[in-house]
């Protein structure tokens, strides 16, 4: 078995869509990025790639590449899952945390788990997501951005 961790951060801006775990969440601001800026899914992808010692998402999906402009991060997660399978790895489970002051995410977590599990080809019971705040400290506390951390456990087949 191998373990990997992932981290991602994106800035918030008015007029952008907020997508977390593949779920569009109603909010006056969204995350800025080349793809859909899904900070949670990006952290999960990095944790999976790290567990398999395959680099990070920037290596496979470089910002600025026109084919990834606005793409759903769930589609990228499917590609990462396929890459791991081709390299002989299976996903055991993923756990994650999103840090954001607003919006409150509790009501969206089950749907996020289902979307992420489907993209990874695993049971939703193997996907953990927690939501926390930064207690109004730092750039997250000022609602300038969001952060996500993830850890993945994979096995070699």
Curated annotation (Swiss-Prot):
> Which Cys pairs are S-S linked?
none
- Which cofactors does this gene product need? a divalent metal cation
Keywords on this record? Isoprene biosynthesis, Lyase, Metal-binding
Per the record, the domain of life is Bacteria
An MF annotation (GO) of this entry: metal ion binding
Give the matching PROSITE patterns.
ISPF
Q: In which pathway does it act?
A: Isoprenoid biosynthesis; isopentenyl diphosphate biosynthesis via DXP pathway; isopentenyl diphosphate from 1-deoxy-D-xylulose 5-phosphate: step 4/6
Residues the record lists as binding 4-CDP-2-C-methyl-D-erythritol 2-phosphate = 8-10, 56-58, 132-135, 139, 142
Query: What EC class does the entry list?
Result: lyase
This entry's comment on the bound cofactor is: Binds 1 divalent metal cation per subunit.
- UniProt-listed Enzyme Commission number(s): 4.6.1.12
Offer one Pfam family short name for this entry.
Answer: YgbB
In this chain, the site described as Transition state stabilizer is at 133
Reaction(s) catalysed (UniProt annotation): 4-CDP-2-C-methyl-D-erythritol 2-phosphate = 2-C-methyl-D-erythritol 2,4-cyclic diphosphate + CMP
Question: What's a GO biological-process term for it?
Answer: terpenoid biosynthetic process
Where is a divalent metal cation annotated to bind?
A: 8, 10, 42
Give the protein's function. Involved in the biosynthesis of isopentenyl diphosphate (IPP) and dimethylallyl diphosphate (DMAPP), two major building blocks of isoprenoid compounds. Catalyzes the conversion of 4-diphosphocytidyl-2-C-methyl-D-erythritol 2-phosphate (CDP-ME2P) to 2-C-methyl-D-erythritol 2,4-cyclodiphosphate (ME-CPP) with a corresponding release of cytidine 5-monophosphate (CMP).
Assembly description:
Homotrimer.
HAMAP family named in the record = IspF (MF_00107)
Q: Which family does it belong to?
A: Belongs to the IspF family.
Check the record and name the PANTHER family matching this protein: 2-C-METHYL-D-ERYTHRITOL 2,4-CYCLODIPHOSPHATE SYNTHASE, CHLOROPLASTIC
Protein name (database record): 2-C-methyl-D-erythritol 2,4-cyclodiphosphate synthase
Q: Which organism is it from?
A: Dehalococcoides mccartyi (strain CBDB1)
Q: Which gene name does the record give? A: ispF
């Amino acid at each position: 078995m191998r373990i990997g961790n992932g981290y991602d951060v994106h800035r918030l801006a008015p007029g952008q869509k907020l997508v977390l775990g593949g779920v569009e969440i109603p909010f006056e601001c969204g995350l800025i990025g080349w793809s859909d800026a899904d900070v949670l899914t990006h952290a999960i992808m990095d944790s999976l790639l790290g567990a398999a010692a395959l680099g990070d998402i920037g290596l496979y999906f470089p910002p600025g590449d026109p084919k990834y402009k606005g793409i759903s991060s769930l589609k990228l997660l499917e590609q990462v899952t396929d890459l791991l399978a081709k390299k002989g790895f299976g996903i055991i489970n993923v756990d994650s945390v999103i840090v954001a002051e607003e919006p409150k995410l509790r009501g969206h977590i089950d749907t996020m788990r289902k979307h992420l599990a489907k993209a990874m080809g695993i049971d939703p019971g193997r996907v953990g997501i927690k939501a926390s705040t930064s207690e109004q400290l730092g750039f997250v506390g000022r609602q300038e951005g969001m952060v996500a951390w993830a850890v993945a456990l994979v096995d070699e087949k």
